[in-house]
Design a protein with these regions (language model features):
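Helical "lid/coupling" subdomains associated with nucleotide-phosphate turnover
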Residues: 3-39, 44-96, 111-211
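A generic, well-ordered mixed alpha/beta core segment in the N-terminal half of proteins
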Residues: 96-106, 110
Length: 212
């Protein structure tokens, strides 16, 4: 369920009451599914939004009244590791893979083989954070787009050499943002429903956005 806690971070990095209530309501709807899980097999974690939120402890205290176990705020690389494990258990072994997960406040990139992550990284670039930083008015233009690309390249430059040297055979996107991009390329006729998201499709999407 889409909650987008990161969208509820105000200018002081505090979660707004509305964002907290969205998150708590989601947890209340979800908690019933946890009743069949043994407590010793259950781990409840929070990621970037609560890592960033100065008042994250308030949300965790409220959530403790709903959940069977306390929330653990995990580091970015641990988030990346867990993402990789989740993806690897849903796919056939296909050599070395790069897994990309674009979240609301951060993006995780992991290179691994089978069930073993080799390189894990979490970068401060997410779809909600970039929307607020570069497209706050809901408009995409050349200037704002180029600023967003520059910021993303700056983040990626910190890991580019390591990841290029490690190499990969396939790329897997695990986030809603990537799924949305693929669906748009299908709807626009730039790829068919059986194809993966391609660089060609992304380039066409980029060009159309910049012309809008």
């Amino acid at each position: 369920e889409k909650v987008q806690l990161a969208a509820g971070l105000d200018e002081n990095k505090n979660l707004t009451e509305a964002a907290q209530q969205r998150g708590l309501a989601c947890l209340a709807r979800f908690v019933g599914r946890l009743s069949a899980v043994q407590p010793n097999r259950l781990r409840i974690v929070a990621t970037n939004a609560l890592r960033q939120a100065k008042n994250g402890h308030e949300f965790i205290q409220k959530a403790a009244e709903i959940l069977p176990k306390p929330i653990e705020i995990i580091a970015g690389r641990e988030e990346a590791r867990l993402i990789y494990l989740g993806v690897s258990h849903t796919m056939e072994n296909s050599g070395r893979r790069l897994v990309i997960d674009i979240g609301g406040g951060s993006t995780e990139l992991i290179i691994g083989e089978e069930f073993e992550p080799i390189h894990t990284e979490s970068l401060q670039m997410g779809c909600v954070a970039y929307t607020k930083a570069f497209f706050a008015e809901g408009e995409i233009n050349h200037k704002s787009f180029d600023k967003a690309v520059f910021a993303a390249r700056k983040e990626l430059s910190t890991i580019a050499n390591t990841y290029k040297n490690a190499g990969w055979d396939t790329v897997v996107g695990s986030s809603g943002t990537i799924k949305a991009c693929r669906q748009i390329t299908v709807n626009m006729g730039w790829s068919n429903a059986q194809e993966n998201l391609t660089r060609e499709g992304l380039e066409k999407l980029k060009d159309k956005d910049r012309k809008s």
